[in-house]
């Protein structure tokens, strides 16, 4: 399906299942950017580092430093993935509250 959507000026953003199987089934020409989400934990950073290393030869890798609570969280991710562009998403207690209450964050 993605091959049908190829062309200049087109953007397809896929939120795929966890893991790299889907990425590796695509042809390198079908990928421009792979977004890797890194959580600030030992396991989260390790998984992100492995994913970024595996994808770097196939596409540009952008890392989302997700749920950042303090500077040390960001520094740990930055130290593990220094060669990649980094986008920071801070921890937001409204998201957790909305999830607990079964609401959309904008409804709080």
Regions found by a protein language model. Give the residues of each.
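Conserved catalytic-core segment of NTP-binding enzymes
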Residues: 2-91, 97
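C-terminal boundary of histidine-terminating zinc-finger modules
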Residues: 99-108
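Residue-level detector of flexible, active-site-proximal loop/helix-junction positions
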Residues: 92-93, 102
